[in-house]
Amino acid sequence: MCSVEKIVRLRHNLLCHVRIHFKTKEDLDIRAFLFSLQRELHAVAFLNQGSIRTLYEKRVVDITSESVQSHAIIETARNFALPNTAEEEENMDRKPELQLSFKGSMTSKIIHIYVQPFDS
């Protein structure tokens, strides 16, 4: 089972940083992945009148957003990062980790959420 640890309740309009790590035995079709991911993220940004940047380096995808509802970014990234079932993960042969951090404008406290993939 996937475990999700939320340390603090999320608020709207936080600076948001999402990092997706892929541990794959085979090469990931990153262009198709990024195309789908960016399409979803930019739709979220458009609806919330914010901005989102996506950067890919090797097997890490970095997503940075400003003035966007954080929970929408989390749900979008999680949908792309985590397989629905253990069988799907085996079929896709990827073991992603999704790390998110948020920084509010009222405090310097950073909120960490860690989504752990299925046990291998």
From Swiss-Prot:
It comes from the Eukaryota. GO terms for biological process: DNA recombination. Its main location: cytoplasm. Keywords: Cytoplasm, Nucleus. It is found in: Cytoplasm; Nucleus. One of its GO terms (cellular component) is site of double-strand break. This is Uncharacterized protein C409.16c. The lineage of its organism: Eukaryota, Fungi, Dikarya, Ascomycota, Taphrinomycotina.
